[in-house]
Amino acid sequence: METNFSFDSNLIVIIIITLFATRIIAKRFLSTPKMVSQETVAHVKDLIGQKEVFVAAKTYCPYCKATLSTLFQELNVPKSKALVLELDEMSNGSEIQDALEEISGQKTVPNVYINGKHIGGNSDLETLKKNGKLAEILKPVFQ
């Protein structure tokens, strides 16, 4: 006796998408929030205020590379006016990233601050550049 199993490919796709979406939702909304010490948060706030430009990045991140290229090559921000932290090369990089999430609500890198104000990530930086607002925000950096 031969059994013939036939699956609708659309059903398989729907099941895969449902499983993927369930995993994302569970991770985002049901995960335990990470506890960041207030000492670490204060330290990160101090780091943000040390220089006019602060960027938290990771060496392998293409968006981080694009942000650094925009700031330092295209816009010629003096490196002496910036603090760039490569979180993946730091022993406490994940703690710093968690503190940045608590401070700004942004977990991803790059995480950019200019003159102590949270700018966002690479797409936010590029939008400001495209709209002509980034040059205005950076004016104090060049004074």
Curated annotation (Swiss-Prot):
Q: Which residues form a coiled coil?
A: none
Cystines in this chain: 61-64
Matches recorded under Pfam families: Glutaredoxin (PF00462)
Share an example GO biological-process annotation for this protein. Answer: glutathione metabolic process
Gene Ontology MF, one: glutathione transferase activity
Chain positions found as Phosphoserine: 37, 91
Give residue numbers for the modification (S-glutathionyl cysteine).
61
Q: Where does glutathione bind?
A: 58-63, 109, 122-123
Q: Which residues form the Glutaredoxin domain?
A: 41-143
An example GO CC term for this entry is:
cytosol
What UniProt keywords are attached to this protein's entry? Answer: Cytoplasm, Disulfide bond, Electron transport, Glutathionylation, Mitochondrion, Oxidoreductase, Phosphoprotein, Redox-active center, Transferase, Transit peptide, Transport
Do you know which InterPro entries this protein is assigned to?
Answer: GLR_AS (IPR011767), Glutaredoxin (IPR002109), Glutaredoxin_euk/vir (IPR011899), Glutaredoxin_subgr (IPR014025), Thioredoxin-like_sf (IPR036249)
> What CDD domains does the record point to?
GRX_GRXh_1_2_like
Presence of keyword Disulfide bond = yes
| Catalyzed reaction equations | 2 glutathione + H2O2 = glutathione disulfide + 2 H2O; 1-chloro-2,4-dinitrobenzene + glutathione = 2,4-dinitrophenyl-S-glutathione + chloride + H(+); RX + glutathione = an S-substituted glutathione + a halide anion + H(+)
Read off the transit peptide span from the entry.
1-30
- Per the UniProt entry, the signal peptide is none
- What upregulates this protein? In response to exposure to reactive oxygen species (ROS) and upon entry into stationary phase.
Query: Per the UniProt record, which EC number(s) apply here?
Result: 1.11.1.9, 2.5.1.18
Note in the entry: Present with 31400 molecules/cell in log phase SD medium. It is unclear whether the long polypeptide observed in mitochondria represents the immature form of the protein before cleavage of the transit peptide and release of the short form into the cytoplasm or whether two mature isoforms exists.
State the protein's purpose: Component of the glutathione system which performs several activities such as glutathione-dependent oxidoreductase, glutathione peroxidase and glutathione S-transferase (GST) activity. The disulfide bond functions as an electron carrier in the glutathione-dependent synthesis of deoxyribonucleotides by the enzyme ribonucleotide reductase. In addition, it is also involved in reducing cytosolic protein- and non-protein-disulfides in a coupled system with glutathione reductase.
Query: What is the protein's given name?
Result: Glutaredoxin-2
Q: Which organism is it from?
A: Saccharomyces cerevisiae (strain ATCC 204508 / S288c)
Organism phylogeny: Eukaryota, Fungi, Dikarya, Ascomycota, Saccharomycotina
